[in-house]
C-alpha cells in the first residue's frame, strides 16, 4: 500500500463534488492531493508538485483527457508517472476507446460513478505494480 510519503496525487476533475470528496477522503489517509478543474489548472499543479499518480477525468471543459495525458507525459519527469482515467461516459466502455486512452499513456481506465474506496484500491494496485520486486 502506498505510504503518505510516496502517494502525493493530482486529481483533474471538473465535477466539484467528486473532486472534493476524493481530496477529503485521501487527506484522511494522510495523502496529499492537489485538485485541478481543467487542463490548464492541471499543468500548473504539475509544475508545482511531483505526484506519484494522477487521476484524470476524460471529459474536461477545456481539453480532452487523452490529449492532456499526452501533454503531461511530455513534461520533464512525468513520462513514467501513472495516469488513471475515470469517465462517466458509456462511450469509454468500448474497448477501442479504452485502448486509445491506454495509448495516450494511461495506466488504468475506470468508470464513474466509482466509490472513492474502490478508486483507492485501484491506485494501490497501480503503485504496487511500479515498485521493483
Question: What kind of feature is each model-predicted range?
Answer:
Residues 16-34:
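Two-component/phosphorelay signaling modules centered on CheY-like receiver
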Residues 38-41, 64-70:
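Acidic catalytic/metal-coordinating carboxylates
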Residues 35-53:
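Acidic, metal-coordinating helix/loop segments flanking the phosphotransfer/catalytic sites
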Residues 67, 90-108, 121:
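Alpha4 helix (beta4-alpha4-beta5 surface) of REC/receiver domains from two-component response regulators
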Residues 112:
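A Lys-centered signature of the CheY-like receiver
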Residues 57, 87:
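Active-site residues of response regulator receiver
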Residues 13:
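Conserved acidic carboxylate
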Residues 1-10, 117-133:
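Non-catalytic signal-transmission and effector/linker regions of two-component phosphorelay proteins
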